[in-house]
Amino acid sequence: SQRDMFNDEVIAQFSQLRYSELVKQIRLAQQPEKVTLKFDFDKNAPCVWLNQQPIDFKDRKLDFAFYAMMARSKNIEEDPIERPTTESSKALVSSAFYRELALLANITMSWGKDEVDFLEKLEDADILETRTVKSLMTQQNDGSTGVNVSFFDTRKNNLYKYLKQKLPQALANLIMPISE
């Protein structure tokens, strides 16, 4: 039944919606071809528009940038971004993630020799917290910095949990850009 698509937490969250709006959510999950996503890169209030419904990411900027990176990769890039398990994949994922963070902060994307400066600009723009900058700058065993497997997995898990809080699980599964 359609009721089975919602857990109690989701029903409680959607209690402010009319029943007809709730049914629209269920039907949307059953018609993936009708799902559209639009990313709004407002640094003060980023959100993802799922058809006409906003999903607020104001307090989840890292998750927003991660989501944008993965969705963009899935939809337009020839080599979709995957879990960064090698030095080259870490560099690819870091570059793509930094690109989304730069778009969100509305700053020029520059790093490489100036990776520390770039990350500090993101911190100054209230996109990154100090602990996140330190995490991205921590050298791994292979000498690389940036997005490592642990950081990637944490972002993926946090994003999925957040989407499940905001949407029926079937719809969250549908719009999650990588398998959980």
State the predicted function of each range.
Residues 27-32, 77, 119-128, 143, ...:
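DNA-binding patch around the recognition helix
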